[in-house]
Amino acid sequence: MEQPVIKEGTLALIDTFAYLFRSYYMSAKNKPLTNDKGFPTGLLTGLVGMVKKFYKDRKNMPFIVFALESQTKTKRAEKLGEYKQNRKDAPKEMLLQIPIALEWLQKMGFVCVEVNGFEADDVIASLATLSPYKTRIYSKDKDFNQLLSDKIALFDGKTEFLAKDCVEKYGILPSQFTDYQGIVGDSSDNYKGVKGIGSKNAKELLQRLGSLEKIYENLDLAKNLLSPKMYRALIHDKASAFLSKELATLERGCIKEFDFLSCAFPSENPLLKIKDELKEYGFISTLRDLENSPTPLILDNAPLLDNTPALDNTPKKSCMIVLESAAPLSAFLEKLEKTNARVFARLVLDKEKKVLALAFLYEDQGYFLPLEEALFSPFSLEFLQNAFFKMLQHAQIIGHDLKPLLSFLKAKYQVPLENIRIQDTQILAFLKNPEKVGFDEVLKEYLKEELIPHEKIKDFKTKAEKLELLSVELNALKRLCEYFEKGGLEENLLSLAREIETPFMKVLMGMEFQGFKIDAPYFKRLEQEFKNELHVLERQILELIGVDFNLNSPKQLSEVLYDKLGLPKNKSHSTDEKSLLKILDKHPSIALILEYRELNKLFNTYTTPLLRLKDKDDKIHTTFIQTGTATGRLSSHSPNLQNIPVRSPKGLLIRKGFIASSKEYCLLGVDYSQIELRLLAHFSQDKDLMEAFLKGRDIHLETSKALFGEYLAKEKRSIAKSINFGLVYGMGSKKLSETLNISLNEAKSYIEAYFKRFPSIKDYLNRMKEEILKTSKAFTLLGRYRVFDFTGANDYVKGNYLREGVNAIFQGSASDLLKLGMLKVSERFKNNPSVRLLLQVHDELIFEIEEKNAPELQQEIQRILNDEVYPLRVPLETSAFIAKRWNELKG
């Protein structure tokens, strides 16, 4: 069942080094702490104490990020050479402990964020700005006053500081705090502000005039508020004041996107993950505490459950049976041995998406099976393995988005999934309308039922009420399944679910478990190379432009390019790729900016995240989404392996890092050739198009000959190619003119000439549009459809729907063929380790095959994909390449 996005909670942002340094110096006031070997442990002791405190308070910080300082020179240090230079060097004893502390944080499962060239304060400012949650900054640094708002608070370890407290303490608003710092300076960071003007006068100036800029715009008013000496200092130190304000201003845009759900507080005590290290460094009392402390009950952290204790003595009873011992579970399993047993099931997760329990419904009776020690599960791993094996052997399992549940059972309990009987109502909903697949929206759409919204679950006060909610959801799941099976979904689509989509889910699970290996040392080198290159590019760009600004800020870039440099503007002052390409020749920095952006995206999307996501075998396990696109095309996330660039040299460097899992294997890439155009020939039955494919001719050259004649055919082939593909993507003359960079009239003339030469294609496309208008549906090769609502639609919307409908026919049918091909190959090599399907990218399949039999395996896979997938009126064709690295799978 679809799990809700968590909208409530607090994000804790930790000023890591400041916290650790303070702990170290507090411990060093007395005798410096060391272990029995004489190694200093004061900072590590502070870290352990901090984690203990945070774990105790974890309900108030369900999300946590440790912000780190950049290891390279920061922007502020580049602006002011003396920045922070007045600070004493850190003691050697402390420096020895910092790498250990950072390693411990990562081992404990905490998310640590460092951004090259920026301080931890900037990381915190950016994350606090992006955060959808209430945010608490753990620091004593007064610079964070500028961030205070209804959503953001500052906590110094004892006291919470809010926006109103800033007004009360300093007499100014948080938004004025950088102006305040610009005047008074900051001795700890070594910027001066205005010499001789203190907090009292700074407050008066800002209360009267509002900002540093307004003060200097109204010097006659400022003069009346200051002594003559202070006024002279204000005039003299103007440059210092604005530099100080700039240095005090935290960068809120050094991080553009962030997955906040990835930084959930670990469900178990993080210190358990560093027990060996604690022993090595002499934390004996901490180890003793860990051994003596009971495992906490965390049922109350589940998104479906509230934050009250899970156990109570309320007399109210639930209709759910809690399976707390072997006897009732064994009795339940015996009931399943009769034929046609159906079990409606869902996982119960905590806020970190960790599985706590399995809830299921059988013959109108609900059951709750705790699986984690945190819920006092009494069952051994072996007992549960046997129980789930029997359950899947005897019963059909029905759920909404079943893949996570089945993947969990396979990963944790090694339950075989090959011959199980399953039904996924999310797939059924997808086949009825691919744009409505969420459990809540499907219930509302088809059963006119609304579940209690997840965000209101905090109103429940007892364990019984929580279980009752699970019972309500499971019964709703049963009604939804019955709705689809008893007329809510056409019989041909029910057959499609049974014969194609459900087996395909099992193929996807196999691909996810297999994973795609990366060359980790290569990616570590590439990460550093990209870091260095980004730094060089940034310096080159800033030198060419002559202004120091944040290159990652579209707003600042827009101001610099269009206002300072006076480059030709677009209406929205946009700096997206399309806009920058139009002014590419107007300034030498533009090409470098585009290069910087591409590299920065690769760095932040792939190099660093891939190293974080790899497992112990250096494999990346993406998650495939079967119901995520309206056309039926497969998508993936965490990470998105289908989006790894292929057309740029830098993008190919990312693909180069993906390799075969061992020296006995190699990679095989098999790519369908012009699959959408073959479908166009099949559907339209155009004799010229069919003949070209049947005789193996160059289809784009043949089209070019038909349009422009033999003499110009080769020269105009690219235009013919754009028209060929444009038709199946629903492209009109406007889009074609933009694609080819030609006039609208010329684009129209090409399309008219094309349809005049291929009238049967025009007739077919017109028939399809009429059919879409009539039925509000666009059908694929296998009978799937996409739904369009033309009610009240104007001509513009209708035109868009018709283009999308035509596109859905071809993209959806191509998806059908890819699924059939993947199923055929998977069935042919079932339980055969010589062939492993790793990935689908558009019309290409990536396999891992035994190298010793590579030519024979390639030939057999191509034969299946070419000849056994579907009897089109024209042949399917594939090209194939064998290599050791992904980037080499090309001609």
Swiss-Prot record:
Catalytic activity, EC: 2.7.7.7
The protein's enzyme class: transferase
Position of the signal peptide: none
Domain 5'-3' exonuclease: 1-313
UniProt keywords, alphabetically: DNA damage, DNA repair, DNA replication, DNA-binding, DNA-directed DNA polymerase, Exonuclease, Hydrolase, Nuclease, Nucleotidyltransferase, Transferase
Biological-process GO terms, alphabetical: DNA-templated DNA replication; double-strand break repair
Disulfide bridges in this chain: none
One Gene Ontology molecular-function label: DNA binding
Keyword ATP-binding on entry: no
Region spans: Polymerase: 492-890
Highest taxon listed in the record's lineage: Bacteria
Positions of the 3'-5' exonuclease domain: 314-488
Reaction catalysis annotation: DNA(n) + a 2'-deoxyribonucleoside 5'-triphosphate = DNA(n+1) + diphosphate
NCBIfam families: pola, PRK05755.1
Function recorded in the entry: In addition to polymerase activity, this DNA polymerase exhibits 3'-5' and 5'-3' exonuclease activity.
Complex and partners: Single-chain monomer with multiple functions.
Family of this protein: Belongs to the DNA polymerase type-A family.
Protein name: DNA polymerase I
Recorded name of the encoding gene: polA
